[in-house]
Design a protein with these regions (language model features):
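Extracytosolic helix-loop segments that constitute the early lumenal/periplasmic catalytic or substrate-binding loops
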Residues: 42-66, 74-75
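Short acidic/glycine- and proline-prone juxtamembrane loop motifs at membrane-interface regions
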Residues: 136-144
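Hydrophobic/aromatic-rich transmembrane helices and adjacent perimembrane loops
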Residues: 273-317
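Start-transfer (signal-anchor) and selected internal transmembrane alpha helices
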Residues: 1-24
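Signature aromatic-anchored transmembrane alpha helix within multi-pass, membrane-resident enzymes
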Residues: 12-16, 204-209, 314-338
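Specific aromatic-rich, kink-prone transmembrane helix
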Residues: 102, 106-109, 126, 145-169, ...
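Membrane-lumen/periplasm interface segments of specific transmembrane helices
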Residues: 21, 25, 32-35, 49, ...
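Transmembrane-helix motifs of polytopic, lipid-linked glycan transferases
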Residues: 90-115
Length: 441
């Protein structure tokens, strides 16, 4: 079934609205110095290196550290041409927004042409406002943003039973992140269940082999320790079974909410099996951040469950009651969401310490090296060589800038810390509202 011009325009309008809203969320949070993590800075350093035609060196992880020795995400190099034109942290943030908007367009077109314009539009809105997308935007850029449009496109092809295209859109997922090999293998299993035995088996086997190559050869080859750094998180010290049983109520709530936003209709489609690999490594991982609905870990699940919902409702029209149920669940989760915060005028007020932060950064000359904490790290990468407190190693930064009032444990005696960590003599040249800047003589 082909989408009408009206349905394409409706999907485009929804995608554009999503881009505007999530762009606003990202830029306002950045301008207000909202601390999520240092991940956006890490990705900016990698993209900055790619844009300079170099290896993806991320000094935040350690001086000279090649990020391919941490996670295998070469797909982020696709942002480099845009970064060359507009080198800034905001470019990285907006890249994620654009990728999400593309996935919104794909899901909305699929929904309207298979379920009808009205119901399909409602499903498109539910997807655009789903908790996995909002949490990902709130957590700043992550490489899994590239998975959203790819999974949406692969899912749309599955609904149309165009299995060759399912494979075509699935294979690039292997370049997004190392764990996506499990998801691609699951796609192969779903194809096998659909009767595509040879194609499904080949995709599943190829994905597992590719993942093994990445984890056993490529990542260790770029890692100074010669190993994949995150293998120890699976099960932690107590084993996989014990870790799986930890915080079982929280994990169950995450799983239930993931399908509840589809009115549970997703459970009626084989495509929903794609959520299992992600849930498996998250719930077996000894990292509490993995277990809830926060952060970016549910982003890849959103296109999966909404495609499964559309597939189920398309094949079984009786399930269309799921749309209002999903909308109610989604609306409930909107109450304290980052999108809802845009309606609060206080969201746009300058934080009390903003001027002090800007002044501190202005005293670090362009091109200088600086060690910092996560308070301002995302604002310094574009024009400086940046190291992170804790992994600066043998570096001798010209400046050390800490936010000692952010509650993140940074040393309050910045000059003494710098001299002990890096030798030489450092003088405090700025101290205001918790931002302390020391300069090397």
């Amino acid at each position: 079934m082909t989408a009408t011009r009206t349905q394409h325009l409706l999907a485009a309008a929804l995608a554009l609205a999503s881009a505007v809203v999530y762009g606003a969320v990202s830029l306002v949070r950045f301008d207000r110095f909202t601390i999520a993590s240092f991940d956006n800075a890490i990705f900016e350093q990698a993209v900055k290196s790619y844009a300079g035609w170099g290896a993806p060196i991320v000094d935040i992880k350690g001086p000279g550290f090649n990020i391919l020795g941490d996670h295998f995400s070469p797909v982020t190099a696709l942002i480099a041409p845009f970064y060359r034109l507009l080198p800034s942290a905001q470019t990285i943030l907006l890249a994620q927004v654009v990728l999400i908007a593309v996935s919104v367009y794909v899901i909305a077109v699929l929904a309207t042409r298979t379920l009808g314009t009205l119901v399909g539009a409602a499903v498109g809105v539910a997807y655009a406002l789903s908790f996995g997308i909002q949490s990902a935007v709130e957590a700043d850029f992550h490489e899994v943003a590239f998975a959203a449009p790819l999974l949406a496109l692969a899912g749309a092809a599955y609904v149309d039973r165009r299995y060759g295209r399912v494979v075509m859109w699935s294979v690039p997922l292997l370049l997004v992140k190392e764990d996506m090999g499990l998801t691609v293998a699951a796609i192969g299993v779903v194809l096998w269940l659909a009767g595509e035995r040879r194609r499904g088996a080949a995709l599943a086997a190829g994905a597992i082999l590719a993942m093994a190559l990445v984890l056993l050869v490529i990542v260790p080859g770029f890692n100074a320790g010669g190993a994949y750094a995150y293998s120890g998180t699976l099960g932690g010290d107590r084993g996989v079974v014990a870790t799986l049983l930890d915080a079982s109520d929280r994990k169950l709530a995450t799983a239930v909410l993931t399908v509840a936003i589809t009115g549970f209709a997703a459970l009626a489609s084989p495509w929903v099996l794609l959520v299992l690999p992600t849930f498996a490594w998250r719930f077996a991982g000894d990292v509490p951040f993995y277990w809830g609905t926060e952060w970016h870990y549910s982003l890849v699940l959103m296109p999966i469950v909404f495609v499964a919902m559309i597939d189920a409702m398309h094949r079984r029209p009786v399930l269309r009651w799921a749309t209002p149920v999903g909308l109610v669940v989604g609306a409930f989760m909107m109450v304290s969401s980052p999108v809802a915060a845009l309606a609060d005028p206080a969201t746009y007020d300058d934080p009390p310490r903003a001027d002090a932060a800007r002044m501190a950064m202005s005293l670090v000359p362009t091109g200088a090296s600086v060690e910092t904490d996560i308070g301002l790290i995302g604002h310094l990468v574009t024009d400086h060589t940046v190291y992170w407190l804790g992994t600066s190693g043998s570096a001798t930064p010209q400046y050390v800038l800490f936010d000692v009032d952010a509650g993140i444990g940074s040393p309050r005696d910045v000059a003494a810390y710098a001299e002990q960590a890096h030798g030489g003599t450092y003088d405090v040249i700025y101290d205001r509202d918790g931002y302390i800047l020391a300069q090397r003589r």
